[in-house]
Swiss-Prot record:
The keyword Coiled coil does not apply. Keywords: Ribonucleoprotein, Ribosomal protein, RNA-binding, rRNA-binding. This is Large ribosomal subunit protein uL18. Belongs to the universal ribosomal protein uL18 family. Part of the 50S ribosomal subunit; part of the 5S rRNA/L5/L18/L25 subcomplex. Contacts the 5S and 23S rRNAs. SUPFAM superfamilies: Translational machinery components. One of its GO terms (biological process) is translation. CDD domains: Ribosomal_L18_L5e (cd00432).
Length: 122
């Protein structure tokens, strides 16, 4: 079995600490972000009902482009704009941002800024 790196353990501790304070409702869902080496994913989650209201990622058809590297800030900004577009179609204007233990920097910040510019309020 492989060992979990100290960096991952620290991120998971931050995730638990943030998750204790942040919950999403139907009126103001939680905008959850997950970042991997090659992709970035965003979901709008209603924690009361336990359902995902909307999702977008660099794997989604409208966002992904063939032959383009998706592990960069430009792709993260495209995902932020896409999740905001889907949220506004479902009359969701205000969300709670859950960075999922990742530092608010780089691709996470680019996604959040693009979602704000596209009309989400958080």
């Amino acid at each position: 079995m492989g060992k979990t790196s100290q960096k991952t353990i620290t991120r998971l501790k931050r995730q638990v600490r943030v998750r204790k304070k942040v919950t999403g409702t139907a009126e103001r869902p939680r905008l959850n972000v997950f970042r991997s080496a090659n992709h970035i994913y965003a979901q709008l989650i209603d924690d009361v009902q336990g359902v995902t209201l909307a999702a977008a990622s660099t794997c989604t058809e409208g966002v992904a482009q063939s032959g383009v590297h998706t592990g960069n800030k430009a792709s993260a900004a495209a995902v932020g704009a896409a999740i905001a577009r889907v949220a506004l179609q479902k009359d969701i204007r205000s969300v709670v941002f859950d960075r999922n233990g990742f530092l608010y920097h780089g691709r996470i910040q680019a996604l959040a800024d693009a979602a704000r510019e596209a009309g989400l309020d958080f």
